[in-house]
């Protein structure tokens, strides 16, 4: 007789083991200190992160295409930050169908140094333009925002399996979503200390 045959996948021990496995996998893959899997869409996770660290503060958004506009959309609808600075991706030429590139990293760093935003929000991968921010770009942004005590939040919803090492790049918080009604948030030490 198998007594475990009637054990539901929703029993507390089974669900707890699943959540523990997800936590361990995410920590290992992203070199994260802490993780949260929360019910709600990617937009829900974005708003939760914004409310946690950007309420009443100046923020900088790197907008590399249509989907990274979502940060600005959330901010305009909710009034979470006191001020939003936006730096957009740029076309690489003047053709009718140009490629796009992220805003020049040196200009972004100078803007961070001058404006001192409390949080910098950026998309790791922008689906609509095909832009991916390379690790060296992330490192420079993180160093600039950390120099005045700010946080760096990276939207990895479209990153797929392009893992970001939070410790190596200096990213403080990563937001992702499997598009199944859940948001995944990962944090490194600095983000946890500021909650």
PLM regions with names:
Residues 2-48, 52, 70-74:
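Conserved N-terminal alpha-helix of the aminotransferase class I/II PLP-enzyme fold
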Residues 2-5, 43-195:
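Conserved PLP-enzyme active-site core in the AAT-like
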